[in-house]
C-alpha cells in the first residue's frame, strides 16, 4: 500500500521507464527540424555550449568527443532525452532537436528554458528540482500531455492556460498563488500545485480530475471540491482546513490525505467507504467513531492528534499499516484484533501494557519508544519483526526478545525507571535486575554516591541522608541481525521520615512526613478577632511555609500559626444619622461628643435602639464583629401652669406629651374662651393636638364679657322668685361694677366655690373668685336702698 503514498513519484518513474535506463536515439522517418537547424556539420560543443549537456549529447549521438561534428540529420534522430542529475545549467542547443517528444532535465540547475519554445512535438517534459521561474517558452507547446515542474521558482502559470491537452500537471513546491490559468484545462486527470494558493474556485470545471494534490498551500475552503466527483486520490496536507463537509460526496476516493490541518470533526468521512489509504496525522482529532465503518482501509495514519480511545478501530481488520504515535493512549487493547498489521507506530504515548500486540504475528515493524513499557514478554512470539524500536521505556529484562531472529534494525537505548522507595539507612542494598538477551545480569556502568557492586547486589554507605541513589547500565546487545546499545538509568528513592510540629497558641500537633515530600496543610486554625496569616518557622517573624512548593527537609521542623488582629467598625446611630470608628479587636472606642436632642436628656450609647446594654467607653472592648451603638435619650418633663386671673394650678408633662385639659373655669358675667399662651391674645392651646414643648409654659384662661341688658322702666317687671324663695330684684347696670345680671343667691355660692377651686380633682369645683363679689354686695345694698325709697314715696303719696 506504500505505492499510494508516492503517487506523483510513480508518474515520474513511469515516464522515466519510457526512456529506459540509458538514452535512445530514434529515427524520425525524415521529419525535418521545425524550430532551428544547422546548415553544416558542427562540433557538438559548439551546438550545446553547456559542458555537461555536451558530454551527454556526445553519448546520445554516438560520438567519441564533444568536438566531433554532427549534422542536422544526426540531431533529428533524437526524440527522447534523459538528462537528469548532470549539473546542467543551460539547455542552449536543444532548439535544434526538432523531433524531441520527451525530455527529462530534473535535478539540474536550469533557469532559462527558452530553447524549448518551438519544440512543438514535445508531449512530456520533466524539469522538476531546478531554478526555473519563467515558463513563457512553454506557451505554444500545445501537444504537451504531461508536464512536471515541481520544486522550482515559478510564480506565474498563465503561459499554461492554452495547453488544453495536458492530462498531467505537477507544479508543487513553487511560489504560485493564482491558479486561474488552470480553469480551462479540462483534460487534466492529475494535478498538483503551489504553496501559496488560497482560492480553489478555478478547479470547478476540472471534473475529469482523478488525482489532485494541493499540499502545502493556504487553503481553508474546499467547498469547490464537491464538484470533482471523479476524484480517486486527494492529497491536501499542510493547509488550513477545518471543515471537510464538502468531501462527503466524493465516494470514489480511495486515497485521502489531510495531514497537517486543523481538523477536529471528521464525521463526514463515515460516507467514504471506498477509502483504502487515509492520512489524518497532525490535526486535533479526538473522536474516531466516524472511522468505524471504513472497513476497506489498509493504511491509516493518526499520529500527532489528541486521541485517547481507539475502540472504533477494532473492526478495521483489513489494516496493514497503522500509525498512532504522539497521542494520549494508555489502553491499546482494541488493536489486538487487527491481525493483518505489518506496520505499527505507538511512540510518544503513555502506554505501560504492550501485551495487546501479542496476537499481531504478521508485524514486521513495531515502534513504541518513549512510553512506560517495562514488560516485553508479549513480544516473544512476534517472530516476523525485522524492525523494533523500544528505546526510552522502562525495560530491564531482554530475555523475551531472544527468538526475534529476523530483526535487522533495533533500538533499546535510554531506558529509565524508578524502583519503589525503601527506607533510608546508613547501609542500603538493592538487587540488580537488568538482564541481557541471555538472561545474564548486566553489571552497572556507574553507581552514584560511591556505591559498590557485588553480584547480584548494589550497596551504598550513606552516613548522612540523601533522597535517592542510582546506577546506570550500558551494554551492546545483538538480537537477530540487529545490534544496539541497551542502556539506561535505575533510580532508588530513599524515604526519610521526620516530624513536622504545628503550634497554635501553645497547642501542638505532630505529623510524620517523608523528606522531600510536600506537607499536607492542616485545617486553618481559628482565633476570635484575628485572621490566620499562615504557618511560619518562628513564633513571630520568620518565613512563611508554602505548602505548594516547600518540601520537608531532612530534619524535624516547627511551624507556628501566626495571626493578624482584625479591625471592626463601630457605627454610632443618632436617630438615623450615623458616624463610624474603626477599631482593632479588643480596642477601646473613643467616645463621641454627647449628642443633643430637643426635649430629651442623652442617656448614653447602647447596643440596641431600645433597652440593651450601655457601652462603657472606659472598659467595654471591641468585640470580634462590627457593632452599632445607638444614642438613647430620656424625655424631659416640663411644667404647664394654668393661670385663671392670677390663680394658678400646674401639670407636669413629658416633652411632646399631651396636657390634660382642666375643667372649664367660670367667671360671673363672662364666657370662657379657652386657654392661651398669653394673658391677652396669643395662641389658643389645643389639648387634642398641641404637644408639650421643651420648656415650662403658662396657659392663661381668657374670657369674653357677656353683654348687659338695659333696665326696664315703670316698675312693670315683677321680681323673680328663685327656688329658695328669694326674690331676685330686677337687673341694673351699676357703674364701676364688673358684673351684670348676677343674682344675690348665686353670688355667695360663687365666692364659696372659688375659694375651694381645684380644676382637676373636684367635679363640683367652680372657677376661682375673680374679685367681683364685693361689687355685687354693694349693688345689692344700693338696690335695697332704692327699693325702700320708692316704697316710702308711694306710701307718702297715698297718705295725702
From Swiss-Prot:
The gene is inlA. The keyword Signal applies. This is Internalin A. The lineage of its organism: Bacteria, Bacillati, Bacillota, Bacilli, Bacillales. Mediates the entry of Listeria monocytogenes into cells. Binds to host receptor cadherin-1 (E-cadherin, CDH1). It comes from Listeria monocytogenes serotype 4b (strain F2365). LRR repeats lie at residues 77-98, 99-120, 121-142, 143-164, 165-186, 187-207, 208-229, 230-251, 252-273, 274-295, 296-317, 318-339, 340-361, 362-383, 384-405. It is a peptidoglycan-anchor. GO terms for cellular component: extracellular region. Residues 1-35 form the signal peptide. It comes from the Bacteria. Belongs to the internalin family.
